[in-house]
Regions:
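A cross-family glycoside hydrolase active-site/sugar-binding cleft signature
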Residues: 39, 62-64, 112, 146-148, ...
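Conserved small/polar residues in nucleotide/adenosyl-binding loops
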Residues: 177-178
Length: 179
């Protein structure tokens, strides 16, 4: 067996794990997993993420708005429409305000999953504004960010260079030599 594993990016709160979530999570310590950072991608899954974080002492949470959450409801796939569109009408700033109380929870250790994803047909200006707001929030809260960078490396890099937040880049679609 290798050394201990800390999974820096998980979505066990996703519906894909409904059938076996508890059994799977219960088994992780026996497989060498010493920690998991469970990601909320919008206000709709934040309560489920925190429920897991409070159930398991080795699970912590990251709370944020994923750029894909800005997709129109018809494009959201099996998870259904994100509250960013279905509840807040695309007003991510209002959703960020609704998320603020979660950051007081000691199990919330990061802002994320946040970033840019130019694969999906989400307006670039909205993504940039949201990501910049989440970076500034992370700096204000003195928390790291969990960055999603899909086909948007130049813009992600520019914002990270401008603000220099602590964090992890989890989805990275750039060429190796540019990393």
């Amino acid at each position: 067996m290798t050394g201990p594993i800390f999974d820096t990016h998980a979505h066990y709160s996703s519906r894909a794990f409904d059938a076996d979530r508890i059994a799977l999570l219960d088994s992780l310590p026996d497989k060498g997993v010493v920690g998991v950072c469970e990601q909320a991608t919008h206000s709709g899954d934040a309560p489920r993420v925190l429920e897991l974080a409070h159930r398991y002492p080795w699970v912590v949470a990251a709370i944020g708005i994923h750029p894909e959450s800005l997709l129109p409801a018809a494009d959201c796939g099996e998870e259904g429409p994100a509250p960013t569109v279905s509840v807040y009408g695309g007003d991510w700033a209002a959703e960020m305000q609704a998320l603020m109380p979660y950051y007081d929870d000691p199990k919330v250790v990061a802002v994320g999953e946040c970033g840019l994803d130019y694969h999906w047909p989400v307006p670039k200006d909205a993504q940039l504004a949201l990501f910049e707001a989440e970076i500034r929030l992370a700096l204000e809260l003195d928390k790291p960010i969990i960055v999603h960078d899909r086909q948007a490396h130049a813009d992600v890099y520019a914002l990270l260079k401008k603000y220099r937040p602590k964090g992890i880049v989890h989805c990275y679609s750039c060429l190796l030599y540019t990393s």
